[in-house]
A protein has these predicted regions:
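Acidic two-metal-ion nuclease catalytic site recognized across multiple nuclease folds
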Residues: 1-4, 163-202
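Conserved non-catalytic scaffold segment of RNase H-like nuclease domains
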Residues: 1-117, 130-152
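Non-transmembrane, interaction-prone segments in cytosolic or luminal domains
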Residues: 42, 47-50, 88, 101, ...
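Active-site catalytic microenvironments for nucleophilic, acid-base chemistry
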Residues: 106-109, 128, 164-171
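Acidic, divalent-metal-coordinating active-site segment for phosphoryl/phosphodiester hydrolysis
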Residues: 153-167
Length: 202
């Protein structure tokens, strides 16, 4: 797809101990999928020791246990690898408002700076077409018939997000005239702001 020509992206997903890094919750898994010229390339994922017990409600979502993360790489190793894999790339998330605060808190805790990259949010791209509801990653994967991956594990969700991005980008290109990844990033953020404003008014 012409929109992706010459552009390098990193599709990221996380699994966590809870919903708010400000309350001490942290990463238990992170994944990165390279997307070069629109094609899925190298993938990487790792478990992360959050330094606290994984609560039952978090385990119920992703199935990751304290025993599984016990021998995970240290934060400095994971942060350095994540920084390397994201270098020079536009970042892609499904719901950046959830993942990025966790990643930034993790990077700071490991002595690294935040991931200051342009961002495309597939949640925003979906809301731009379908409105506020029904835009979970699983629901969108079903809507578009995307291959089933390991849901609520970081690599499975990152791969699904990468495939979803290609589907949604094609629609934004053909139906809304978006021509570059920079325009796609702006469109995703604009859609998130607009739907958020409508939900507050409604």
């Amino acid at each position: 797809m012409a929109l992706f020509d010459g552009t390098r992206l990193a599709v990221l997903d996380t699994e966590t101990t809870g919903l708010d890094p400000g309350q001490g919750h942290g990463l238990v898994e992170v994944a990165c999928v390279a997307l070069d010229g629109g094609e899925i390339g190298e993938t990487w994922s790792t478990l992360v020791d959050p330094g606290r017990p994984i609560p039952p409600d978090a385990f119920a979502v992703h199935g990751i246990t304290d025993r599984m993360v016990r021998d995970a790489p240290g934060p400095a190793v994971v942060a350095a690898e994540l920084e390397r894999r994201c270098a020079g790339r536009v970042l892609v998330f499904h719901n950046v408002a959830f993942d990025l605060p966790f990643l930034d808190a993790f990077m700071r805790s490991a002595g690294h700076g935040p991931l200051l990259h342009a961002v495309v949010d597939t949640l925003g791209l979906a809301r731009g077409f379908f409105g506020q509801g029904g835009n979970s990653l699983g629901a969108l994967a079903t809507r578009f018939g995307l291959p089933a991956e390991a849901a609520h594990r970081a690599l499975g969700d990152a791969l699904t997000t990468a495939r979803l991005l290609r589907v949604l980008a094609a629609r934004w290109e053909s139906e809304r005239g978006v021509r570059t990844v920079a325009e796609l990033a702006a469109a995703s953020q604009d859609a998130l702001r607009l739907t958020s404003r409508r939900s507050r008014v409604g």
